């Protein structure tokens, strides 16, 4: 489960941001997870709940936003959100596409006190 190592890095990042802003605790952590990121939201939630104890995020709420796959079609120049895992442009059906979102995980925001 690589979610544990992801959460450890996430908690370190939260601590760095809190320290840099003079905060004593983090009350909310918001992340965005792309459906192609390979990160399982349920496992990430479990890992966060496990590892946040005795950290600056001890009482933090953890919010996960799921990002669908967004593409740009090189043929018709359309931006689209894929509804299923069919990697073709929904407008012209070309497979000459570039994924523009939905592959990564990002720390979107922190609420600090």
Predicted regions and their residues:
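Short, flexible, mixed-charge glycine/proline-rich loop motifs
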Residues: 61-69, 78-83
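Short hydrophobic/aromatic patches at helix-to-coil boundaries
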Residues: 109-113
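Long, charged N-terminal interaction/targeting segments
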Residues: 1-58, 63
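Short cysteine-rich clusters marking metal-coordination/redox-active sites
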Residues: 73-76, 89-92
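Short functional micro-motifs and their immediate structural scaffolds
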Residues: 81, 97-98
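Cys/His-enriched microdomains
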Residues: 71, 87, 105
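ATP/adenylate-binding site constellation spanning eukaryotic-like Ser/Thr protein kinases
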Residues: 94, 104
């Amino acid at each position: 489960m690589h979610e544990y190592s992801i959460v450890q890095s996430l908690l370190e990042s939260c601590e760095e941001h809190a320290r840099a802003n003079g905060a004593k605790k983090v009350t909310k952590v918001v992340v965005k997870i792309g459906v192609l990121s390979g990160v399982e939201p349920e496992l990430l939630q479990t890992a966060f709940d496990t590892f946040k104890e005795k950290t600056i995020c001890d009482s933090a709420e953890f919010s996960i936003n799921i990002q669908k796959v967004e593409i740009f079609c090189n043929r018709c120049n359309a931006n689209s959100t894929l509804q299923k895992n069919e990697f073709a442009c929904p407008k012209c059906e070309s497979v000459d596409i570039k994924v523009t979102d939905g592959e990564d995980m990002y720390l979107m925001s922190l609420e600090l006190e």
